[in-house]
Amino acid sequence: MSDNSRKPVTGIFFALGGGVTLSVNDLAIKALSGSYALHQVILIRAFVGMAIVLGVIWFSKTGFRQLRTRRPLDHLFRVSIVMVSNVTYFVGLSLMPLADAVATAFVAPLLVTLMSAVILREQVGPRRWAAVAVGMVGVVIMTRPGAGVIQPAAILVLISAFCYASSHMMTRRMRLTESAMTLNFFVQCGFILVSLSFGLFAGDGHLAQAPGSTWEFLFRPWHVPPVGDWWAFLATGVAVGVGGLMMSQAYRTTEAALVAPFEYVGMPMAIFWGVVVFGSWPDATAWAGIALICGAGLYTLWRETLRRKKDLDVAAPSGDL
């Protein structure tokens, strides 16, 4: 088997492994959301993730030289939207069944398509626009607007998906000058600085919200975790560090349109964790939303693959492919 033929298999392997690993992060955050403050969880997660990033940098060929950047303001903006994406997603996750939150977040690939057309002026055909529309119908279903009441948690996850898609736009803008390690390093730095500052300000619990309120997870006081809970703190840090690196490797070695559909392994994993750990099985409404959002996302990625293959066939001289 040639190196070229191995690359897609390797990229798919990393994408599947990364998707499964990152699903552990959602599981761990969900498990911790009933007892701890979000900024405490994020701080510990960031320290663990930073240790992994620094370890990889230490053993890499270019070492810490790769952390030099000429785009500090772009990093600041990207880190800011990544943090908003994380906070809104995890607050929403604390209030929703795991599978519902993950399904709603999977609207992000559709938002990337929308932003690519509006911001990057990329051509989007009518079929992909139709897929975006179908996915948005799924989003409306997931917000459960019965009796005129929109579920606030779902709105938070939608805000997260928008910010997540925006971070992809920033990554594309920065990809020619910034390495994956540089992007990851500054994100972890941002998490550490902001969560530590927020903890010093609100960690005593003076902003604590009433039990069951939307922002309870964000404003709880800090407390020292018992030994029995450390598995979840370590799991979320390791999952983000290792899963993020696996996803980066997948997209580095294999065409994005081929890799992206395999990220949807996170959906069955979310259903699995929800049933096994939390005893939460998606209801009929959730299944309808999951089918529409994931189906539309996968169709969009499939159309993108066909479009790119057609472009390559047209561009390549006869006999080159």
Please state what every model-predicted region is.
Residues 35-84, 163-167, 187-203:
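Transmembrane alpha-helices of multi-pass small-molecule transport proteins
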Residues 19, 23, 54, 79-87, ...:
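Hydrophobic/small/kink-forming positions within alpha-helical transmembrane segments
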Residues 102-107, 175-190, 241-275:
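Helix-helix packing/entry segments at the starts of transmembrane helices
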Residues 30, 53, 149-210, 219, ...:
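Transmembrane alpha-helical segments that form core, pore/gating elements
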Residues 127-144, 160, 285-304:
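Hydrophobic transmembrane alpha-helices of multi-pass small-molecule transport proteins
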Residues 10-16, 63-88, 152-158, 209-242, ...:
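Loop-to-transmembrane-helix transition segments
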Residues 108-130, 268-286:
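C-terminal transmembrane-helix exit sites in multi-pass transporters
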Residues 268-321:
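C-terminal-most transmembrane helix of multi-pass membrane proteins
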